[in-house]
Swiss-Prot record:
Keyword Zinc carried by entry: no
Gene: fhs
Reaction(s) this enzyme catalyzes, per UniProt: (6S)-5,6,7,8-tetrahydrofolate + formate + ATP = (6R)-10-formyltetrahydrofolate + ADP + phosphate
Pathway given in the UniProt record: One-carbon metabolism; tetrahydrofolate interconversion
GO MF assignments: ATP binding; formate-tetrahydrofolate ligase activity
Naturally occurring in which organism (per UniProt): Lawsonia intracellularis (strain PHE/MN1-00)
SUPFAM superfamilies attached to this UniProt entry: P-loop containing nucleoside triphosphate hydrolases (SSF52540)
Coiled coil, from the record: none
Full protein name: Formate--tetrahydrofolate ligase
Keywords: ATP-binding, Ligase, Nucleotide-binding, One-carbon metabolism
């Protein structure tokens, strides 16, 4: 690779690398896939027939399983996807057959401030444009499946308003569901960040006209927070997916009984939208390593994991399979540990905690970096004091990973502005708490820059481990929420709103709660529920304002703080810098 990320943008590096891509069939052959197990999407992307592969390799042993997580990030992100790809490249340089699993990027962040989550520099996945803009259509399928349930609901409400019970039955053998228009937890979804759609009124002419819908309050969430996406991430196979889809609660009737997609007779059609999407996607790093891309839930407002199916494939096909959890240990790794591994039955061999000097300085008192603006001078000048104070956040996360019984490996994702003294301080503090540390320069040098990290991960995978969940699922839901708050976030207490307590008690009484997971919704920018609180906040309480219930996924979803399921678009979004070269048809400006 001749282009240096010091001199060229990510999209320029990607376009240069794409001239030498392996075809998806050659990529699959290197991975051990049969020709017929790949469904091509063009020459360089494809889907993998997971059912055929897992059946063929049923008796094969699994490879080593590594999760990549991070400290509490800045709004800029600390390079987890870049590190995931760089680690796979480094492992390949060490002669290990390796693969990665990452999430499909959402159009919201891609067109917003965070970018496409394709990695960066010399550790990114290609083809970049296709990966970043729609890919193989999985998120579109999720949107269609989800929104179809809302079409079924709103049209049913209109017909029940317009017709008597006898007429409903005569027209289509339809029984009245008696839907309560004030108790509809589900909304619509789209794959962009749009604060104007958080609260809307639909069916405005439905009051006076019988054919214009049903007038009521509604809302949009971002598509990756959809329960359909959550089910895609945790389903073992299509049968499991189909069963879960039928249990999604769309609304409640006027007696408070749940109305599901099965009640609306839309669950089969929703599944039909997803029959291709359930097969994981396969692309490559710029050095030719296989990258599975499947599912795309955020970690702050959803489960934050790539799919169980993709990980099962990677473990059967690779000696080392690296998966990624969204945001920090408190958000993404906690859900990997206590939800994804519970559903999959898989246990990790190591956890990589990505940190940067930049993030440690932000936790140590430096001004918070703002996307789209120049970094304050505190981030480009040496300041070991900021690094040392901010390392409390890193150490907190190291100790959390240790509670899971998995050996942590701290990856210092090196920036060109880091100084030897700052790096030495991080290494010293990590070694004092018994964590392996590796400095990695994969962004600048690709796999060659990740050899120290690869060696540390190989070493950690050979260490004895005793993987244990944080809590017993037989505990009451409230106690499990409190345990996450105390043990993972460091809260002194949990305050539940009256509405949250009411919903928790009802869920506890109406369901076998030992079958339900706890999927927290909380800001990713702090250990607390206040994004302004950096480092390791003390003397604080977690504020649970509401509870959602994902009946199909089997999640109780506590919502803490002021976070919303529909992010907004800021004042300097990246779409302002994305364009097309009309002579070549190439997209430029994606990062």
């Amino acid at each position: 690779m001749s282009l240096s990320p010091l001199n060229y943008a990510d999209w320029e590096i990607a376009q240069a690398a794409e001239k030498h891509m392996k075809t998806v069939y050659d990529l699959g052959k290197d991975l051990g896939l049969d020709h017929k197990e790949i469904f091509p999407y063009g020459h360089y992307m494809g889907k993998v027939d997971y059912k055929s592969v897992l059946s063929r390799l049923e008796q094969s042993s699994d490879g080593k399983y590594i999760d990549v997580t991070a400290i509490t990030p800045t709004p800029l992100g600390e390079g987890k996807s870049t590190t995931t790809i760089g680690l796979v490249q480094g492992l390949a340089k060490r002669g290990k057959r390796s693969s990665a699993a990452i999430r499909q990027p959402s159009g919201g962040p891609t067109m917003g401030v965070k970018g496409s989550a394709a990695g960066g520099g010399l550790s990114q996945c290609i083809p970049l444009t296709q990966y970043s803009l729609g890919f193989t259509g999985d998120i579109n399928a999720v949107m269609n499946a989800h929104n179809l349930s809302m079409v079924a609901l709103t049209s049913r409400m209109q017909h029940e308003r317009n017709y008597s019970d006898e007429k409903l039955y005569a027209l289509s053998n339809m029984k009245r569901l008696d839907i309560d228009p004030t108790n509809i937890p589900m909304g619509w979804v789209m794959d962009f960040c749009c604060q104007s759609l958080r609260n809307i009124i639909i069916g405005i002419d439905g009051v006076s006209g019988k054919s214009d819908g049903y007038m009521m309050r509604s809302h949009f969430d971002i598509a990756v927070s959809s329960e359909v996406m959550a089910i895609l991430a945790i389903a073992k196979d299509l049968k499991d997916f189909r069963q879960r889809i039928s249990k999604i609660i769309v609304a409640y009737d006027k007696q408070g009984k749940a109305i599901t997609t099965a009640d609306l007779e839309v669950d089969g059609a929703m599944t039909a939208w997803m029959v291709e999407a359930i097969n994981p996607n396969l692309i490559q790093s710029i050095e030719g390593q296989p990258i599975f891309v499947h599912a795309g839930p955020f970690a702050n407002i959803a489960i934050g994991q790539s799919s169980v199916i993709a990980d099962r494939l990677g473990l059967k096909l690779s000696e080392y399979h690296v998966t990624e959890s969204g945001f920090g240990v408190d958000i993404g790794y906690e859900k990997f540990w206590n939800l994804k591994c519970h559903y999959s039955g898989l246990t990790p061999d190591a956890a990589v905690i990505v940190t940067t000097v930049r993030a440690l300085k932000s936790h140590g008192g430096a001004p918070i970096p703002i996307p789209g603006r120049p970094l304050p001078k505190e981030y480009t000048e040496e300041n070991v004091g900021y690094v040392e104070v901010g390392s409390a956040n890193l150490i907190h996360h190291i100790n959390t990973v240790k509670k899971s019984g998995v050996p942590p490996v701290v990856c210092i994702n090196a920036f060109t502005t880091d100084t030897p003294s700052e790096i030495a301080k991080i290494r010293q503090l990590c070694e004092l708490v018994g964590a392996r540390v590796a400095v990695s320069k994969h962004w600048e040098y690709g796999g060659d820059g990740a050899l120290e990290l690869a060696d540390a991960v190989i070493d950690a995978c050979n260490e004895e481990k005793n993987f244990l969940p944080l809590y017993d699922w037989s505990l009451p839901l409230k106690e499990r929420i409190e345990k996450i708050a105390f043990e993972v976030y460091g809260a002194e207490g949990v305050e539940f709103s009256e509405e949250a307590i009411y919903k928790l008690n009802k869920l506890q009484a109406d369901n076998n709660s030992s079958d339900l997971g706890v999927c927290m919704v909380k800001t990713h920018l702090s250990l607390s529920d206040d994004p302004k609180q950096k480092g390791v906040p003390d003397h604080w309480k977690l504020h649970v304002r509401d509870i959602m219930f994902f009946g199909g996924a089997g999640f109780v979803v506590p919502i803490a703080g002021s976070i919303t399921l529909m992010p907004g678009t800021g004042s300097n979004p990246s779409f302002r810098r994305i364009d097309v070269d009309t002579d070549t048809g190439k997209v430029k400006g994606i990062f």
